[in-house]
Amino acid sequence: MATHLTSTHPELTAPGIEMWMEEEAKLYSPIFPKVFTLESTSRLYEDDSSIAGIDFLEEVGEAAASPEDEFLIGYMWRYQQKVFKRKISVSKLLRQTDLYNKVQENSKELSKKAAQSRDVQAFSIFRQAFGATPVYGDGKNLISVAHPRKDGGAAQRNTFIDGVQRALSYDNLKLLEDVLIEVYSNKGIPIDVGLNSQLMLMVTPYNREAALQIAEADGTPGTADNSVNYWKGRNVDVLVNPYISWRFAYKMGETTSTDREAWDKRYFLLDPYYAKKVLKFKQLQDFEVNAWEDDDTDVWFAKVRDVFAVGISGWYGIAGSLGDGTTYTA
C-alpha cells in the first residue's frame, strides 16, 4: 500500500516534492527544439515521408488545361511512442535527519535528468549519423554518399563529394555548404535548401573554438589581408551541442571506440527550415513527476515518466563530416 508522504518538514510531502521537481524542469532549456519540430500527438504509431516536391509551373496556352503534378510519396519513417522512466528512493531515517537537503537535491536532479533525457534521445540520430544503425527510410545512414531517389534518378550525397571527411575549417565548410545546396527532391526537382534561411553549424564542444572563429571573425581566419569573412556575412548560427559528443555516445552504448578526440571532430551544417521538416519529436504530453511513500517500508519514492517518439523522414537540409580525414563510403 502506498500513501502520500508525511513529514515534519511541510514541503517534504508528495505535493511539495513534485513542486520542486516541476520548478527544476522549468529551469532547463532543451536544445532539441532548435533542430527538431516538437509536436503533440495521441497516436501510438505515426508515419511520415520525405520530400517529393511539387514541380514548377509550365507555360501553357490561354485555354489549355493545367498540367497535373505527379503524386509521389517519399521514403517513409514510422514514429513509435516509447516509454522512459526513472525513480529514486530515500529511507525515512534519512528524511528525518540532517540529510533532508539531499532529498531535495536528488529530487530536483531526477527532474533535470528527465528534461535532459529528451536531448539525449533526440540527438542519438546525429550521434549515429555515420553508423550502421539506424538507417532512415531509404536504407542509408543519415549521412551518406549514396542516398537513392524515389523516382530512380541519380543518387545524392550529404557529405563531401569524394567522401573524404575533412576537418572543420573555413574552406571545408564552404565545400560542405555546396553539398548542402546542390540537392534535388525525390522527383528530381531542385530544392532551395540553404538559400533562403539562416544556416546552423552544429559542433561538439571539441570544435567550439574553431566554429566560433569561423562564424564570427570580422576577417577571413588565417589571412593577412583581412578579407571579408563570408561566414559572418552569411549569418551562421553556431550550436555547441554536448549531446552529439563521444561521452554521450559511449554512455548510450552507441560506440565502443575509446578515441574520444577522433569522434568529437564531427560536425554538421544544417538548414533548420528544411531540417525541421524531416526531424520530428512527437510527445504524448510533458513528462510526469510523482512522489509517494510506502507506509509499510517507510521508503519514499520519486518518479519521472515520459513518452515520446523521435525520428527522421529525410536528410534534406542536413550535411555532415566525421572531420577525421578518413574516406567515408556508406
Predicted regions and their residues:
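Internal, conserved structured core segments that host functional sites
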Residues: 125, 129-148, 169
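Long, contiguous amphipathic alpha-helices that act as assembly "spine/axial" helices in icosahedral shell
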Residues: 77-134, 201, 302-304
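Intrinsically disordered or highly flexible coil/loop and linker segments, enriched in small
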Residues: 26, 30, 37, 41, ...
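N-terminal alpha-helical "arm" segments
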Residues: 1-29
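Catalytic micro-motifs at enzyme active sites that drive phosphoryl/nucleotidyl and oxygen chemistry
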Residues: 72-78, 122, 187-189
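Short active-site-adjacent helix-start/loop capping segments
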Residues: 53-55, 96-98, 307
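Assembly/oligomerization interface modules of large self-assembling protein complexes
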Residues: 22-84
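Sequence/fold signature of self-assembling virion shell proteins
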Residues: 2-6, 143-186, 195, 200, ...
